[in-house]
Structures are given as C-alpha cells and as structure tokens.
Amino acid sequence: MSVPAALRTVTVIVAVVLATLGLTTAAQAATINYVALGDSYSSGVGAGSYIDSSSCKRSSKAYPSLYASSSGASLSFQACSGAKTSDVLNNQVGALSASTTLVSISVGGNDAGFSSVMQDCILGGDSGCKTAIANATDYVDTTLPGLLDTVYRTIRSKAPNAKVVVLGYPHFYKIGGSCSVGLSDTSRGYINGGADALDTVIEKEAANAGFTFADVRPAFTGHEICSGSAWLHSVTWPVDESYHPTAAGQASGYYPTFTAAL
C-alpha cells in the first residue's frame, strides 16, 4: 500500500471512530433521567402488577413505568401509596440531582384527608359528606398551598435542570350515571367539587413554581365511577385500591395526559 493510500485509510478509520464516539456521546446526552415522586395515583395503586412486595404498591402498569418503557428513560420510581407532602420531602426527594432531567409528581390528596372524607361520605349521608368536603376544602385552601410550595421549591433546588410535571386528580363520579345504589348524586357532586378545589390549588402552586400542570379530568370524562366504562375503582378489595385508577385509568388517563405535558 502506498503512503498516500495508507494515510487515506487511517483518515477514514479515525473519522469512523470519531463519528461513533460522537453518536455515543449524543445518546448519553439524550438519556432521560426520570424521577417519579408522589402518592398512590403515581405509584399505581389499583392498577395491579406491583413491582415489589412493599406497601408502596408501585405498579408496572402505572404511568411512570409505562413512560419509562416507551421512552427508554432511566426511571427512579419513588412514588408511594399513602404519601403526603412530608413523605415526599423525607423519603423521596433524595433521588433528585442535577442530572435529573424529568420529574413527575402527584401529591396533596392525602394531606387533605381524602380517605377519611370518602368514609364520611359513605357513612354520613349527604349532610356528613357536605361537612367533610367543606372541612377538607378549607384545609386545601388555607394550609395545602404552603405545603406544596415547600415541596415544589425543594424539587427545583435539588433538580435544577429538570422539567417538572405536576399531575392532578380526576372527578370520581358521573352524575346521573348508571349506579343504582350507594351514594346519592348530591354526595357525588360534593366529592367531585372537592377534587376541583384540590386541582385548583395544585395548578396554581405548580404555576407559581414554574412547573407544568397536567389536568387528568378531561381524560377521565366519561370514565368516572357510574359511567358504565369506569377507569376508577369504586369500593373494592383490597380496600386501599378503592377510588384509584384501574390499569386502564393509568394507561388511557394518566399516561397520555403526562406525555402530552412533556
């Protein structure tokens, strides 16, 4: 081989190596480092197919798992059943770092005492439900904003380079729907109103933090309890899965709402 030919061969080899390195670097740079924070609506309670035996009930059918599978994102799945804002701060945000590029979170319902409100509505009739919702709404309006502000500020501090998507909660009932027993439509309306109050505060605080709010209510319209095509469990066993999205609710409600916000 002549010297010029040899030089050309070396040049081609070097170019190929550099191109390969460049592709590798670009792929590494494009890796989505995703941390899923929050409560049972993000962990996937009610969707089944739980990843481990912990009480967090993280599901492979929850929207964080679905997104990681479809996008190839590296997922740190921190969301946990029953989590309040304090649990996010104490047990979850440690997974965040400057290399985190995407964060999702749903939180606030447990702080407002959602499970006890539902119990009061089931056992206390319209009057008891109205009182329970009023008390919860007062908490949501006066106390929850400060708690959310602390959580959101902490997320931004620990993950300064991340896009943050805050997901809300659906309406639970279709008014005038197919249910012939159980709560009255009056109580069902109170419960939906409580979800609206919660989402309003979450949306406002998310905007104040510069985060994106993903409203799941439109996606669940027509798929509430009593709709005949529900993506939410009514009272069921295990009882902690009551009033949580089914696998269909995660796949067709939360997941597309989340991805549309990216």
Regions found by a protein language model. Give the residues of each.
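Secretory targeting and sorting signals
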Residues: 1-29
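A short acidic, glycine-rich active-site loop
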Residues: 53-61, 127-143, 186-196, 240-242
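Catalytic His-Asp segment of secreted/periplasmic serine-dependent ester chemistry enzymes
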Residues: 170-262
